[in-house]
């Protein structure tokens, strides 16, 4: 159980470390740097969705023969629809590279800062679920999930959480909030990951046979975030290939981690 708890906290540590950048850097991240970091995060999430979630989901359903894809197919779509629903219900704000704000979700009287944090929190939910379901598979003896593979996913999510923590804390500081407050708000945006990770472990204990569905559910939710949010963000502004290059770096790094440790 100690291994599970540590694994669930590793991604949160990445967010915390990234938010701490507000104490070391003196100004807001440049648009090119933001595109690079967003592309990197997208690459990690796509690779994690494929190698750590969808592939194990299909492998665990091999008893179905040629229909082994069905649990992964169904879980993937449930994940997409779940995030689509949250995206339309939770009031949140997307900040573009050109500093314009795009409000999504139900109308509310929430402050701009809260909605910005909710935007990051929204896509931290599937990341926490992804780590939680993999560690649940490890805990309940899924043959296709190893301790190394679970650690690889946790480390990969932590690595891509580092820039996310910086991207939330530094703009808040640039807008006039104190460094400590900006840091803690950045940390708060990542606190949902261990919470949803723990909840996923508990849910999985009740429905162990549904593990392939849970794995692909997390993958669908993560890929929704990539396509709906991260890819558009890394492509904003003047034409640049920096986002694509760092997407490839993030993808290859996560793939290497999964194969080497898994």
What do these predicted regions represent?
Residues 1-262:
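Intrinsically disordered, metal-sensing/regulatory segments
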């Amino acid at each position: 159980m100690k291994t599970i708890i540590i694994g669930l906290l590793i991604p949160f540590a990445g967010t915390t470390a990234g938010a701490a950048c507000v104490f070391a850097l003196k100004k807001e991240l440049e648009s090119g740097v933001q595109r690079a970091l967003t592309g990197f995060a997208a690459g990690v999430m796509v690779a994690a969705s494929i190698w750590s979630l969808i592939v194990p989901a299909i492998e665990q359903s091999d008893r179905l023969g040629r229909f082994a894809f069905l649990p992964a197919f169904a879980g993937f779509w449930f994940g997409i629809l779940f995030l689509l629903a949250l995206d339309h219900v939770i009031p949140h704000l997307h900040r573009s590279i050109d500093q314009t704000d795009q409000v999504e979700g139900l109308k509310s009287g929430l402050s701009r800062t809260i909605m910005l944090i909710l935007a990051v929190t929204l896509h931290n939910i599937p990341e926490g679920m992804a780590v939680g379901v993999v560690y649940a598979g490890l805990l309940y003896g899924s043959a296709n999930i190893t301790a190394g593979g679970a650690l690889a996913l946790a480390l990969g999510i932590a690595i891509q959480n580092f820039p996310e923590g910086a991207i939330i804390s530094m703009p808040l500081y640039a807008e006039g909030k104190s460094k400590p407050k900006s840091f803690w708000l950045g940390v708060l945006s990542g606190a949902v990951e261990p919470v949803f990770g723990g909840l996923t472990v508990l849910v999985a204990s009740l429905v162990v046979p549904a593990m392939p569905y849970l794995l692909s559910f997390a993958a669908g939710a993560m890929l929704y975030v990539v396509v709906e949010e991260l890819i558009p963000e890394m492509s904003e502004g003047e034409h640049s290939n920096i986002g694509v290059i760092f997407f490839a770096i993030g993808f290859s790094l996560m793939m290497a981690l999964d194969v080497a440790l898994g």
